[in-house]
Each structure stands twice: as C-alpha cells, then as structure tokens.
Amino acid sequence: MSDDEELQLAIEISKKTFKDEQKLRSNDLDLIRFESPDEPARQRKINQIKQLYEANSPGPSSYSGSLATSPIDFRPVYNEPRAGPIPHSQSYPRNYFQDWSAIASTSQPPAFPPPPRPPKPEQYKFPPAPSVPLLHDRYFVPPPPPVPPRHSRVQQSPPVPIHPTPPVSSTPLRHSAPSFASDSQQFLSPIKPFEISFNSTVDTSSNQTGSHDHSIQYQPLTHLYVPYVMHSLNSSYGALLNGDLIDLSAFEDSSNASQDEIRKEFDPLFISTYSTDTPSPDNSMPAVNAYFSKPIDEPECVGGAKLIQENIEFPSSSFCLIDCPNGIEEQVKKLCKRNLIRKDMTPDFFIAPTVDYMVTTASTVKVVVYKDHSWKANKSNGKAMICAIDEKMDIITTQALSLFDSELPTDKEYGLKIYGLNQFLSSDSLLGSNLYTGHCLLNGDDVKLDLGVFAPNSRIYEQTLESWNLMKSQVKYSTVVDKEDVENTLGHLASEMSQYEIAFNDGSTLKLSSSSQRVKQVIMLLCKCLHGIVPEKLYNEMQKYLASTTEDQLVHHRNDFLREIHSFLELYCRCTVSRYNIPPLQIITKPKVEVLSKMDFLQIMLNSVHSIPEHWQSQYSEFYMSLDLYHGTQVLDGFSNKVPKTIKNDHFFPRIPLDLYAKFKRLNLCQYPRETRIVVSISGTVRNSAQAANEYNPDIVMLGYCSVPLYDENLFMRQGPLFLPLTLLKKQPMLKPFGPYPYIKDARDPILIMSFKIWDTEIYFPNVVIDMQCIPQDFATLDIETQEYLLELIENQDTSTLETDDQDLIWQKRLHLTNQPEALPLVLSSLQDWSFGFVMRVYQILEEWAPLRPEIAMEFLLPKYPDERIRAHAVQSLARGSTDFLYHTIPQFIEALRFELYEKSALADFILELSFVSLDFTFEIYWQLQQRVDHCAVDDLPYAIRCQNLQQKMIDEHENPNLKTDIKLQHELLNELDSIQDDLRSKSGDSEIERLHRLRTRLGILDSKLLQNKVRLPICPAFDCTGVRIEECSVFNSNAKPLKIVFRGLNMNYSIIHKRDDDMRQDAFVMKMLNEMDRIWKSNGLDLRMITFRIMPVGYRRGMGELVLNCATLMEIQKEEGLRGVLNDEILRKWLMKHNSDEFAYKEAQENFIRSCAGWCIVTYVLGIGDRHNDNILFTKNGHVFHIDFGKYMGDWQMAAGFRRDRVPFVFTTEMFHVINNGRAPTQYNQKFIDYCCKAFNHLRRNKNTLTNLLRIMACSDIPGINMDSLAFVENNLMLDLSDTDATVQFTAMIQNSLGSAFVRLNFVAHTVAQFISSRPSFSKQDPNKLSFVPELYTENSDGRISRVTVLKFEKHCIPNKIYMYKVEVHRKNVAVSSFIYRSFAEFEELHTKLRARFPMMAVSLNTISNLRSNVRAVAQKRIIHVQKFLIYLFNQVDEICHCDLVYTFFHSILRDNKCDTYIDESLDMPSQCQIYLKIEYNSVKETLSVFIGHAKYLALLQNNQQPDPYVKTYVRPDLRNQSKQKTQVVRGTRHPTFNQDLNYTEFPIEILSTRVLEVSIWNNGGYLVKHKMYMLCIPLLKVKKLAESRKNCRTLEGWFNCEKCV
C-alpha cells in the first residue's frame, strides 16, 4: 500500500469516527464510562489509525493540518485562561487510566521554574520534613493523595530527584508538579499532601474507565470571581466542555446494572426500572381512601424508592402539616453570652466609647460643669475648673460634686454626661481618652459636661403602644409553605383519587380519562404551590398509578405515589424557612459513627433543575454543570460535565434533567475538613452565538450557583436529597463558597435537586480535643539570617503572596514565632491540610500564641479562615479592644456574620454580648442589622434571616424595659419623615415658598407628637428629641428632596439630613474608613484635626446624616463675589479672615486648615473619591476642611461627555494654597503641609492590613463600588512596593501635579455656571443688612457707644495685591484707650450704599468720582478728604442712623485691625542661618548611598529683592572631574523650597566611607547662563560609617543641617 493510499484510508476512517471522537478529544478519557458492546471495535479502529500515523507521521511536534485530518489522539491546544493569569503556556492533558500505585511509580515531568524569590538562608531552600509528634491511633488519619498543579505540563523531561512537595495553594495559581515519595520517606506534615498510594482505599472495581484521574491537580471549572482568592474574572468558560461528571442518562442498556448500583448508593428504596418483577397479590396494599396501615421502614426521598415486601398503610395524620421550629430557630436559641468582654456591662445606660490613646497633646483643659435637666431648680450657671488630661473621670466627678455640694442630695450616685445628651462618661476612663474631649477642643470650645444622677432613665409614654410583635420587621418569603393551601390541595387530591378509583372499578373509559386528568391537575397545582418543583420520581409514580391495568398494580403504585408525595412535602418544608413540617412515616434511628473511621469516598448526584427562569429558556440553548469542594476559599476537588443538558417540558413545568454522578476519590471521607462546602454552578450556551467560527469555544456564560456545607449544624454529614436555590449571577458574577445554608426564598429562583449518598449510619465529625501541649521556642535561638528573613516576611504582612519555600519555613519555625502576634496569619496561611489530625496542632499553638491586637484579629473573620476555633480565638482577641474600636467596628462584625457556617457561632455570641455593653451598642447593632435585613432580603435571604434572628434574640433578651418602645417610636419617626419627603416629591410643580409651607405644616404635626412622646434619634440615640425647630428646617434643592430637620432637645439642638431613595451605605463606609485612618494617625501621634460626622443607613435606600454646623461650601464662599469668585485665588483666605477676627483665632484656623486639608488629600487619594467640585468641599469657620457626597469612589471617576472630569489624584487648589501660605509664594507652612501629607500617607502604608482587612470584609456586602477590585485599587494607591522615602517623593510630585492642574478650576467653573443657570435669581444674593467683610452684626450694646471717629492717614497694604487702606481712630464713651481700624475706600462705599438702602432720606453722600486708575497714591490722597467728610456728616445724623448696627459693625475691629503688619515682609524677622533637611542612608549589602533632599528654609532674597529659584547639587569629594554630581529639580520663586527628591550613588563600598565627604550646595537658577551658589555644607561620611546598622543593613543620618552662605 502506497503512502497516499494509507493517508487516504486514515482520512476516511477519521471522517467516519469524527463525531464519536469529539467527546473523547474534549474529555480526554477523563469521563467514567460504562462500556458498550461496540467499544472493542471502536478501539481497534483507533489503534489502526494510530499505527498508520506512527509509521508515516514525523511526530506531533511537526504536525499541521485540520482537525478532520488530525490523528485520533491529537488534541488541539485551547488557549483559554483559567482562574487568573497563568504565566506559562498550557494544553489540556491526556489522562491515562492508572490507579495511584501505578501513578506513584511513574516518572513525573518537573515543575516549571518558580518565579524569582527574595534571598533566603541557603539551608532552607529545600527544607527537611518537619518532625511531627506521634498521634494516638484514634486520631490517625490516612494521608490523602497529593493535590497536583491545576494544569499539566506537555513537555517531557527526565525524572527529577524526590523532594517534599510544596503545599497546595489556596489560590488556583500554583504551578508545581506532583512528586511521590517512597515508603521510607513518608512523613506526616500538615502543609504537604501525602505522597503515597492507597491501594487499600482506592476503588479497584473492574471498571477502570470509571476512575477519576487525580494525577492532574483539579482546576475549578466554575470560572467565577471568588473573593479573597482570585484577582481577576476569568472570561472563558470553554473548559466546562472538558468534564468528568458521569452522565447516567447517556448509558446504553448494557450498563443498566451499573447504573442501578450507583443509584442505590443514593436511594436504598431504589427499584430498577428494568426489573420484570410484578407485585404479587400478597403484597398488595389497601385502597387509597383507607389511609391506614403500619408505617414503612424509612421515609422516601426524592429520586428513588426502596422495595417494600409488606403491606403499607398511611394514616391520614401523616399528610397534615404540624407546627415545628425550623433548624435556624433551634440554633438561634443556643446563642448566649460567653463573657468575653472584660468591661462593665451597663445595658440601661448610654456610656460614651473611649479610645486607647490621648485625643490631645494638651496637659490640661477647661471643663465647665452644669446641672442636667433632671434638677427641679436648674438656674445656676456652669461652674468651671481646670482638669488634667490624664485624670480619671471619677475624680473629676468628685470635684464637680464639691462645687454643687450644698445643692445636691447625698443619697444618690452621680455621673458626668456629655452636655445635652443622656450619655455618661465612663467613670474609670481618663478625660483625655474620651472622644468628646477631643471633639470640644477640635471646635475650639470648652469641655461642657452635665452632672446627673446615675440611674436608669424611666420614661413615661402617654399613649398606648402597639405590640412589639406586630411592629417588628419581618422578611417576607414568597415560598414559605402555606399550611392551608397545601392541606386543601391534599384534600382535593384524596377526593380526585377516590373518584379515579371508582371510575377504575366501573371500567368506564370516559370517566377514567376525565378523573385521570383531574388527578394530574391537582398534582400540578401542588407542585406549583411548592415552587414549581416536579421531582421525576413523583411524576413517574403518578404516571404508573394512572397507568395501572390491574387492581394489584393500582394498589401497589398508589402507595408508592403517596409515599413520594409525603417525601416531597417533608423535603420542601425542610428546605424553606418554614415553621411547618409533615410527620414522618416512621422515625428511624441509625447508629452514629465518627467520620474518622470512614475510608469511603464522597458521592453526590445532581438530579435536575426546576423553576427555570424565562430568560434562561429564551436566551440559552444548552447547560453545563460544575461541582466543586471548598474549604474556605481553597478548592479541594471538583467535577464538571461535558455533555450538554437541555430544557425539557415533559413534566408540567420546564426543567433541566441532569442525572449526573460524581465520586470524589482525591480524599477519603475522614480527610475532609469540618468546614468543607459543596459548590454547584450552572452555565449556559447563548443561543445563536457565533459558534461556526470556533466550534470548540462557544459563547458560554455562568448563570448561577449554590453552596451547601458538607456537615449540618450538629456536625452530622448530610445524606439524601436536598432542594437548593441557585443564586442568579449579576453582571459582575461572584461565587461565594461561604455563608449560611441556602434556603428557598423566591418563586423566581431556579431549584437544584442534589442528593448525597445515604449511609447505614449517621456520620459525625468528632470534637477535637488537645491531648498534648506544644512547647514554644525562643526566637533568638534561630540563626541571624533566618531571623531577618522571617521578620521581613512578618513586616510585609501579605499572606496571599507567600511562596512555597516561605510556607515551609514559616510552618517549620512556627514554635519560634509564638511571641510574634503578627506572624499568626502567616502560619495559618502556610497550612493547607485542615483535616482532623492536623487541626490539633493548630489548636495547640493557639493556646501558646501571644495575644493578638484587635486589628490583626480582624483578618481571621475572613472566609479564608473557616475553622470555627480559629474564628473563636479571633473573637476573644477582638473583645480586648477599646470600646471605641468595638463600637465603630460593629458594621464589620455584622458583615463577617455572612461568612459563618452556622447560625450558632462565636461571632454571633460576641455581637449579642456587645449589645449588652451599653445602650449605645444596643441601638447601633439594631440598626446595623436592620439595614442588612432590608437590603439583603431579596438577593441574600439566608444572610437576611440570620441578621433578623440575631436582632430578635437581642431585643427579646435585653434587660432594658423600654427598649422595644423606643425602637418602635424610632420606626414611626422614620416613617413620618418618609411620608413628608414623598409628599414633597409628589408636588414637583410647587414653588419654593409653597414647598416650604407644606414642609412646615407637616413638621408642625410631627412636633406635637414629639411633645407627647420624646424619641431617641436612630443616628444619635442618646439625644432625647422633644420637638422640631420648624423655622430652621428646609428642603434641599435636588430630585430626591432630602430634608434638613433640626430637632429640639432638652439643652441643645441636633441637625440632620434625611434621605430616601439614596443608598447611604457608601457614605457610611467612607466615614468608617476615615475614622479608621484618623485612629491610625492619632495612635501614632499625628493629629490632623479631621471633622467626622455620623452617617446612619436605617433601611433600604434611606438613612440619616449628621449636619456639621458653622460651615459653608466652597461655592457658597465663591458666590459672595458672583461668578468671578470662582477665579479669585484669595476668596477662601478672605472668608477665613472674616470669620476669625483676632490673630490667635486666625492662626488656629490656619493650622486647622493645614492639617485637615492634608488629611483629606490622603483620604480622597487612597479611596479614589471622585466627582469633587466646589459644592461638595466644605470649610468650617474654624478652618477645618471636609468633604461630603461620596457617590464616586474606588476609581469610579465622574465622566462628562465621555471624558473623565477627575484628572488629578486629589483636589488641592490654588485657593487652598493661598490659605496655607498667606499668598502665592511657598512658605514654611507649605513645607508643614507636605510633611503632614507624607507622614499620614506612610502611617497608612505601615498599617495597610488594618485598612485592607476592612475592605476585604466589606467586599461581599453588595455596597456599590466595594469589591475585591476596590481592594486592589487601594493597595495600588498605597504604593506598597515602594519604601517610605520613595513614597514621599511620589506623593510630593502628586501635590505639585494637583496644584498645577487647570482641570480642577475648569471643573469648578463648569459647576458654578450650571448652578448659576439653575438658580440665577438667588445666585450671589447678598444680605442687605450685613457687610460683606464682617460675618456678624454688632450693636452699641455689644461694642460701646462711639463718641468720635477720625481719619488719620492712608497706607499701602498688600492683601496680597496692592491696596490703599485708611487708618481710622475710633473713640468710645467711657473707654480710655481708642482703637484703630483699617478700611478701604470700597468698604466705605459699601457702608454708604447699604445705609442709603435702609434710610432713603439720608442726606449723607460719598464722592466716588475718579479718573482712570483709582488704586494709585494720588487718588488715595484725594479720597481721604471725602472719607473724612462722609464720617462727619454721618455722625451728625439722628441716632437711628449714626448709631445703627451697620455703623457699629463697620467700626468693629477685625483681623487686619488687630494685626496691621500681617502683610509686612517676613524677611525682617527671619533668621540669617539657612537650613536644609537631609536623610543620608547607606546600605552595606547593596553598597548604595542615598541622599534624600527634603526642605530648605530661610534662604536669602536676591540682590533685586526677588525670590530665588533654588535647586540642590551633591558631590562625593574628592572628585576632581565632578563625576559624582547629582542635582534636584528647580523650585521657582520661594525662600522655603521643598525638593523631596532622592539622589543615589551605586557601587559604593563601605571601605571608602572613611575617606569621602558629601558636599551639598544650594544654587539659584537665574537663567540658562546665570547660576550661582548660594549655600554649601560638607558632611564627612565617616559619621555615617560610625552609626549602628539597622536590621535591614542600613546606616541612616538625618536631620536639619546648617548651611554656610557663599560670598
């Protein structure tokens, strides 16, 4: 035969078998099949083709051609991404059918070279196996087979030496190949898979094609975004076609016996459908209308039936629903307080939270004490005293009592409360550890306290309140069993079945057909009531019953039919949140055995999918299933099916029959961790997708998933069938292998019927008992190199990037790390085997580990640590946190509840116990739970139920008798505010006056209600609301019509903004992050004086926000000068000067501005807060900067016409720059601002885990914009790959970039113009009764009567532009010393204009005529006469005019009057010595010298009195050729430049430090050819060499250095 003939024959054979081999190529023999009779012939054809190509083909490596002509064993390479980026090319492996003994003796290809790793000690590059103490035989767990890499290697290589296999990663990104150890090398290590064969446990059935190839590490085929593991979505789902789930429905008749064996594993009642046996008359059952007989041996389960050899009768009571608590309620009852919190419990009081640092650096503060409202005669003024900041509150209380000794009864206990609130300060706290103290000092106020009786506040309500049970919110379930409907349907079924049997006995064909249809209709109605689920066995038994031909068959099938109905009802009740169930036919008690004795494999069947959504039916043609096992977020094993499944309409409603079977042979049952979860996902092929172009890569998308624990809440392994709702995936699919048991929640959710194997025993996971203690080792006993390397790993604090060798090293040295609290996450992340035998060792080291800081313990609440004892240990550490930490972390605690496996958990107990600390915690926990109940009831019902049950448990067990009433009144207040807002929005055509009138009318009704029953505000429950200040309330001008409400209290008012149809969870989260950043800064001694305010979401898209008083937006400030104000750089500084009329107040406001502006620059940059414009940046009159409106964050930038409006890292404008520097030239204040920014930024970088853990916990909260991508965004913004010095350089450059950007100004202008167009009449409208340069009105009574005023002279000032000011002397009656004020001619004009407007008949005039330029000396000289005449005429008017409030306001002293030399050149007061900040660092390992050039100050002016343009040069002398010259950038026009640049010298041996000198010089860049040296200093590098070397091999010399002036 010629070569052409052989090739032609091969092609023809390939064409004949191409369709049959498509599945083989995509599955690659990975599917367990029951062979058909044609299998030998098919194999012969395959071998024939192989022989032909082996004889003529040059080899697979050089093969090219189409698939139709390819060899039968050739597989095309599908370049489809797996779970994240894979750096190496891959192809799907060929899987050979070998058991573990065969695989163990097979040479394996070596692993790809690992990525570069940091240097580590040589002796630990291939660490030896750790020594492990022998375990008791009872706890011995056979080692599992290794978990190989997720993708195989295609190239072949010689065998490699045997080394311990690295641990399996918790992420799907490991690339290590498996290796197998000999028996002599066996060891028991929890971080290494067991590398031995298990012939005794492997299924050695003759059907070798049914084995799952575990030589290839399982790649999870869910292709979903799994939080905390994957870093990017996998866009390819084509790998689902390469499956290995067994499709039982695809077998031919010859394999029916094998199918029956599999089905019996899941259903002991299974009867083969191919059995020819017929029921005998002796085994017949009584008529259906009797319903009485002895019960069957075991309840039926959906999916099969057990062969019954005796008569069965069903009592009528077996089909009646009975009341019974569901499993969730039983778990909730077990929640209890564990006494974890070692603090005083005061559940009847509001106690202010305290911090573990001092809120101020002051040593003493002024405290003013008042008597609270409870005293009958409370007319005494407050009494002041000076208290030390570190003094205890009980001592201060005693001092306060001594001030009121004669006025107070002595038989009561007293305490100090926050002024105006019913919130006591903790008696054992320090004055400086109370946040209220810092709040008062932040606003420049005295610390005002109320003295009151420390006793529960008894509240009397005048109206009768409704029952709590009628008021409390309940999650509405659309699929909870309706008892009446089900029982009525069953009654109809019994009637129709009786009619059918009568027709059957009569033999009437017409009646039989009619009654048969009615029975089907009733069953269809029953299935429709129960979520549209139609179990296949139920439908088949109904068909058999209606197709019976003999009486014996009728009786037999009737009872089978009823058994299936009973099983269906019982299972549905268990799978919904129902308080009903159906009594079992018989209670069967199985013996209980520990899972440690079970060497079997886990077996699961996927039966079918029901309640198919309409869009699935219309948009998808085929469906594929994936079945994975998870421990936390670590994949243990998995299967997927390659055979497409389609929607069938043969059973009442559309369904997807699956009939898929999986047997997990990677691990034995005894080796699965306690927290193992089963995750099932479904994907679909899009209809009419372009599959012709790529037949092997159709458009497949993931549609939904469900997750269920392997063990129930009592730690018994699940058995039998389950109804599981599939969570529909949204636009951004996310698989969550954690959380509560999924209950059926919505009639629209598809339902999966999944079955576990039914065992003869109840299998439970035993309690882990520590029978021995570990002995901690001294960290100092390790060699220095290992210590340094471990400390570096701990300092990095990144558990997700640990290399294999790092994991080995950390686990081996775990006993040396017990005194390093920060190392515990690294140790636990290095452990990959969490089976029974290995968790004992983890629990041993937990007992000896150093106490964790609460910030570290937060990480263990993440789902990647599912072990219940690990989480309980974390809760114990959290309980040691300060009350302020616990209070502000309540949202994270409640979010972490969604990661708990069961309702009863240590975290749930901890939250319950927190609610009893004080009423502050009680109300905060209640409303945090409430908002999640409302938001999650639709998309995450199990979590919503969990929150609601905990909420109910807290309310029922709380000791405060008025709690339920208080909460009910809060709900009523919120409903009333919602009603008012809806009323205003419904009248969109009303004018502003009409809208305000309607608001005040409704608020008047609310005010009367509050007078009867005072309400605790949800946002501030310690505030007793007694009414509303109606005249101060208003409506904000936006589409949602948010309300500004000012509530009246006993001693103070409380202002809020109430919003509806606006998700305020984003704003609340940003404020939480801001509070955490502020806590980090203050605990490190950096107080940036940040203004924080409360945001409280109280339900679905509604909430309250605290209003900050005495503030204005930047737009409101700019509007004072009209549209041109947005272009005025001085507008903000003038506004601050106007509101701070003395020098001390202005300097304090300027300091507040510098600090808070630096803080908000950091916050907005790190969190990526966008949509920044001049209407959401605010300034208080005390100088604090703060932002509002956080709808755009985490890189979600505001867009306009397709362009990004936010072009800068953060908003830092020239207006802010002018406030900081008192003008346009950089000063020392600018250096201070930059230092604050860089210090704050580096503090956050060092505490990154505190921030990132909060983000990780909230990543699954469904808050818009918060996900794992936002975590990556924050980590990227923190520049974690840079050193502190490099980060300082980068952030300084960003400050300059933001300041120099023109886009911010353009954005402000565009927003201002838009506001001007929408509100033109009221835009920049000035108050005619006030002067623009004085914020308040002053009168004769406040300032004293003016007797005479005299214009003395005029002076030229720079503010900062040139202006002529008139100095006026003011004499007041009975005041010996006159005062001086400085006013411009424009201000005299403003006074004249407003006086004429108020008094039209006034005859006083002011000559304002000037020719051309008015701001010149000659014109100022002429105007002084006009001004003097104006003042003479003014004070000759009647008192009503000359002594009105406008006149006294004009002559009131302001800032420029108190400090007339504010704008005089500062050079006169400057030191003559120039200084420069340097940081010189030498690294002896890298042999590098780094010179960081920071600031320079006190540079001299140039000869022409101009500001210099400095830059810095450095040399390492001696250097005759100046080859070592390096220089910084030029800083223009300043005597106080900031460089913040790092200059580096490489290849710098340590030996030459002794002979070298660092020369640093400051130069002025006068032009291209005009440059001269201004200052110079020389630093011998010997000083650096003499310094001690740090742990990182660095010697550092830093500080301010004096420079010598060059002549």
Swiss-Prot record:
Q: EC number(s) for this protein?
A: 2.7.1.137
Disulfide linkages recorded for this protein, renumbered to the chain, are none
Q: Which GO terms describe its cellular component?
A: cytoplasm; early phagosome; phagocytic cup; phagocytic vesicle membrane; plasma membrane; pseudopodium
Residues of the region (Catalytic loop) are 1168-1176
Write out the ranges of the annotated region (G-loop).
Answer: 1035-1041
Quote the catalytic activity from the record: a 1,2-diacyl-sn-glycero-3-phospho-(1D-myo-inositol) + ATP = a 1,2-diacyl-sn-glycero-3-phospho-(1D-myo-inositol-3-phosphate) + ADP + H(+)
**Residue ranges with Pro residues bias:** 158-169
Domain (PI3K/PI4K catalytic) ranges: 1029-1303
- The annotated region (Disordered) lies at 54-91, 105-128, 142-182
Q: What processes in GO biological process is this protein linked to? A: cell migration; nematode larval development; phagosome maturation involved in apoptotic cell clearance; phosphatidylinositol 3-kinase/protein kinase B signal transduction; phosphatidylinositol-3-phosphate biosynthetic process; phosphatidylinositol-mediated signaling; positive regulation of phagocytosis, engulfment
This protein is called: Phosphatidylinositol 3-kinase piki-1
Q: What is the lineage of its organism?
A: Eukaryota, Metazoa, Ecdysozoa, Nematoda, Chromadorea
